[in-house]
Amino acid sequence: MDRTPGAAGPARVDATGWGWRHAGRRRPAVQDLDLRIHAGERVLLLGPSGSGKSTLLHALAGVLGGDDEGEHHGRLLLDGRSPADARGRAGLVLQDPDSQVILARVGDDVAFGCENLGIPREETWRRVRDAIDAVGLDLPLSHPTSRLSGGQKQRLALAGALAMRPGLLLLDEPTANLDPRGVAEVREAVARVLDRTGATLVVVEHRVNVWLDLVDRVVVLGADGRLLADGPPSVVLDERGEALAAAGVWVPGVPLDV
């Protein structure tokens, strides 16, 4: 685990009867969620399309928006605080590599989040170098981001999140748009980051097999946005695989009902 000064420890998540309904929608995206994720746990979040997985990740990152964007009920806490009040405690990486590259040079792009948090320049660039090393992106800080592959761009996004020293790492289908080489690069980078930082992980992914040996828990949301299953991967996928597939969840080796 990272013991350097200013490094955040792993975060914990507590949801009690939590739900969210997007503005203009009748049905909540997530509803009546009771969930506790302990500091340092590694969770694979599954569910059919529209079950609220991305909504939950955005809520944990504190970027769902205000009252004009929707309404919530219950409580969702990150280290005992509202995620919106825990700025910098959660780092979110999305599925589209191109949409996450902001600046023209590798170093500047990784530094962007730290600068927004008001971290001093000297500390920011120390974090940038540490983060780039952690994700295995062996490139000079001046390297053009336009010349990166898809897998390299996702590792760049991961480095940008890591530089902010989050206690909770949120990955929303990070390999969805990558070829097999890019998938392997990102998965290996995440494993290195977790080994180095001990951060809590929540990853949403349809490529379940990529993450099974890295996570210690599987949480499943149903089509109605409610908690459907929660437990060790072997229990959830092996013992409940057919029932989950019938509910629209992709499970390795079990055909979906269509």
Question: What is the predicted function of each stretch?
Answer:
Residues 61:
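Helix-to-loop junction immediately C-terminal to a conserved catalytic motif
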Residues 122-140:
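Conserved ABC ATPase "signature" region
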Residues 144-148, 152:
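Conserved ABC ATPase signature
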Residues 161-162:
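ABC ATPase C-loop
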Residues 165:
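Conserved catalytic motifs of ABC-family nucleotide-binding domains
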Residues 169-172:
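Catalytic Walker B motif of ABC-type/P-loop ATPase nucleotide-binding domains
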Residues 205-206:
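H-loop/switch region of ABC-family ATPase nucleotide-binding domains
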Residues 224-249:
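Conserved beta-strand-loop-alpha-helix hinge in the C-terminal portion
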